[in-house]
Amino acid sequence: MAKFANYLMLFLLVASLVMLEAQSSDTIKVPDLGKRLLMNRDPNGIPCAESCVWIPCTITALMGCSCKNNVCYNNEL
């Protein structure tokens, strides 16, 4: 029960900070952390969580991933 209360308080704190930020500006802006998470800094594409060192992309190939530099990447954004 204590963990739930801690998570609930953390959620309420974050929600209130987001609400204050949204009300303080006329337009809703994406925070810097959100911009960093949305930006793709890898020139190969988005990693598909599969390597292709010994065998080609098998499971993630169904999602459009291909092998580049021994890692499966998805280039469709």
Swiss-Prot record:
Disulfide bonding pattern of the chain: 48-65, 52-67, 57-72
Reported tissue expression: Expressed in fruit, pedicel and stem but not in leaf and root (at protein level).
Cyclopeptide (Gly-Asn) cross-link site: 45-75
Signal peptide region: 1-24
Keywords: Cytolysis, Disulfide bond, Knottin, Oxidation, Plant defense, Signal
Post-translation changes: This is a cyclic peptide.
GO terms for biological process, alphabetical: defense response; killing of cells of another organism
Claim: Signal is one of the keywords in the record: yes
Tagged with keyword Disulfide bond: yes
Propeptide segments, given as residue ranges: 25-44, 76-77
Residues recorded as bearing Methionine sulfoxide in the entry: 63
A Pfam entry, by short name: Cyclotide
Domain note: The presence of a 'disulfide through disulfide knot' structurally defines this protein as a knottin.
Family designation: Belongs to the cyclotide family. Bracelet subfamily.
Function recorded in the entry: Chassatide C2: Probably participates in a plant defense mechanism. Has no activity against bacteria up to a concentration of 80 uM. Has cytotoxic but no hemolytic activity.
Record's protein name: Chassatide C2
